[in-house]
Amino acid sequence: MTLDREELRDGWTVSLVEDGASGVAADLPTGVRGVTLPATVPGQVHTDLERAGLLPDPTFDRNETRTQWVGQSDWAYRRQLDVDPRGHERVDLVCDGLDTVAELSLDGVPIATTRNMHRRYRFDLRQVETSGPVDGKELEIAFESPYREAERVAARAGSMPGPYDEPFPYVRKMASNFGWDWGLTAVTSGPWRPVAIERWSTARLADIRPLVDVEAGEGVLDTHIALERSGPTLHGTSTGDLDLDGEDDDLVLVVTVSGPTVDGRTTKQRSRAQVTPKEDGAVVTVRVPDAALWWPRGYGEQALHDVVVELQTVDGAVLDRRSFRTGFRSAGVRTALDSAGRPFEVVVNGTVIDVRGVNWIPDDVIVSRVDRARYAARLDAAVDLRANLVRVWGGGVYESHDFYELCDERGLLVWQDFPFACAAYPEDEPLRGEVIAEAQDNVARLSRHPSLVVWNGNNENIWLHDVDGWGDELGDRPWGLGYYLDLLPTIVDAVDPSRFYTVASPWSGSESIEPNHVDHETHHSWDVWNRVSDDHYRDSVPRFVSEFGWQAPPAWRTLRDAVTDEPMTPTSPGVVHHQKAADGMAKLARGIEPRFGSAGDDLDRWHYLTQLQQARAIATGVEHWRTHWPRNTGVVVWQLNDLWPVSSWSAIDSAGRRKPLAHELRRLYDDVLVAIRPVSTVDTAVRAVPTEVDDRTGGPAPRTASLPVTDVAGSGTVPGDDGRDDPSRASDASPVEVAVRSARTGLDTVVRVRRIDLSGRILAEETLPVVLDRPGVAVVRLPASVGVVDDARGEVVVADMDWRRAVWTPAPDREMRWQPARYRATFSATPEGDGLDLVVEADSLVRDLLVQPDRVAATGTVDRGFMTLLPGERVRYRLTGVGEADIAALTSEPALLTLDRVLAERRSEAEA
């Protein structure tokens, strides 16, 4: 008989536990005691309480402070359970995710205790002795407040350093449930992933690890399969004449792979292995000649192959069956020492990938609410931003298969953190055992996904240990380093050696080098946001930037829907509550001030300028780093998404609305990026050094090729000898240059560079060649006619290549003598009838035009962010969710704003 799985979705209830020994929050509201509520499973108790009207939405206004009692209380989920084996030998209770500290019982008889949100559990119900009929038993999952479990562990481990006054390091639970510098505190409990009954006989497929490689054009799938045999039947359960133990049977494993070949055919290949009674599994290898390869987006197709794994008797009866998709590709990360330090080069199918990534946080603080449709919407947005890598950050969870399947389909590479973030973690029991179990479980579970290329030991823990002086508080107590340097890499190597493991982010490749060193592997650039202006991103060229970001509030409608302050200002209570970063409002103001001046108390002005500053700051970093390839091989912006309406570093807010940053990232992450930057003296070439010993493998380290920057407007000099430091060539030299990064192809085109005054009048113009014989960076030296301005407050430099544009402002915007923007706006219905096409035609220089249809209609969206137009130019905006009745509002402030208007209003106020 084939394994039968019955998911337990219906018939659940949840209630507060009040037995005298359990925890009940002191501020428990009326109406909660003694109430039994219908429960959603998979789910968490917050949603059930909210649905029943017993809990206000924690994300609305300042309700967060009124909902903390939920996480401080104990909760019990119950339902009736049928444990009839129905002819099978085994009946297992399978819990794919329990959040977090739970006692399970059947008719009051204990089953097990759990204490880890991040792993799966399976319980043999034959071991639970109960009486009475098999179809009316009560299953109870009683969840204890995570705070009390954390308190018990903390009492044994002692106080350990961390960023917040919350005990998340002491319990294996989503850390950001306890709040973060972008997140509210909502400590959840509940069966957050499916609960099921599985009935089976003889044996089942216990674990499947499909590890792929490519050898001489042939796809190779090594499927590591572990079996569990049923064992003897207990307690006299009747199963007829079945073989009751399965221990003496030979079994057969069959693996079938079908999918595309390089020439467009569909192929099917099959292999099998016989498993004797003394064996608990086998490795079944399937070779697929001429298999089409899986590539990251932008580098090729995402060829996926269907895999079917069957466990059969020798007579061919199917006992268990699994199916999934995988992709054939080789993948790794090169970190061998070169002339500039240690690179961090993500390599897929032998090609170094120009990584343009986004950091992912949990998309909801009630993480069970995130379904496949939500994942798809967010990941589609990442694709639309032209990202090719998503880093799953270590304060969240290992996401569901839906997330990784969608990344597989979209060609989004995945960097997966183990869930350790920004704190010291105890290494003694019971946490150590839980870490081992969860790591083994998830490394195996996710091994089928071709998108997954990096496992990372932790987020910032080693770096913060050094810079924040944790050693003084810790003394000689272990604090997690053993996990990152020993335990986790050992598990990855044993369970899935096909994946690259990095110790931390940031990490320099060696304990002897400062973890966040710009010349070695991964770097987090947070000093800029926290302390200085964004032009300091240009101070260095890290090898790989795995975190950096700049804050802005959510889209206007999202902010207005979440906060009801009247009047609403940047400093009104609700707006401030929806800002969780330390000194966050002051840092926003500090970012605006040097470039735009003070935003004052006007919310419209503040909202516009913070959005513009976020986009400009991120552009400064990305342009600088990407145009210094191959010294820098990747940029991963913090962050893609949000889990509640908040001022944060996100490009997409919690309602799914795109900030202007999202549209700017489309430009910055394009395969071809045009930037105007200060003249750079950085030697971007990296040269191989004599073969060294790779300290991770003990063998020879791979060599890294030199990829020099092409100088197309100069005399063809080589990096490091370009004459830029020659005083005889410095007179009247342009302080800026055009840099063009082409990630996928060579180039043979021109860039049009104009120096214009603020009315839009052309003062000088040059057309300069841009030629690359392969992917790389072209640096275009500017003649003084266009690169040197006569009036720093009254001129700008504009570079155009095809449809791509870069603008250089010689002085801060606050000092520029911007003139009133003059333009004409016309509307027409979209061909699909779902909105309007807005065409704006400029009669003057129009700087940073922003259209915000969500200020007119809740469903309003726009396909562009900030735009700069020269006289005579036109731009088309596609607006959805609005209609002809909205036209007047769409062409009026504040739905349509330009920089000159915003700054002029502030000057008028200051002069009044």
Where are the language model's segments positioned?
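Hydrophobic faces of well-ordered beta-strands that scaffold small-molecule active sites
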Residues: 356-358, 390-392, 414-416, 544-546, ...
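Loop/turn elements at helix/coil->beta-strand transitions in domains of secreted/extracellular proteins
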Residues: 353, 385-389, 408-413, 448-453, ...
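Alpha-helical scaffolding within the catalytic cores
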Residues: 338-344, 400-402, 437-445
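The substrate-binding groove and active-site-proximal loops of carbohydrate-active enzymes
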Residues: 181, 296, 359-371, 387-396, ...
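Active-site neighborhood of glycoside hydrolase catalytic domains
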Residues: 428-510
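Aromatic-lined substrate-binding rim segments of carbohydrate-active enzymes
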Residues: 389-433, 515-523, 528-531
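Substrate-binding clefts and catalytic carboxylate motifs of secreted carbohydrate-active enzymes
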Residues: 16, 190, 455, 502-515, ...
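Secreted/periplasmic carbohydrate-active enzymes, especially glycoside hydrolases
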Residues: 1-389, 541, 627-628, 632, ...
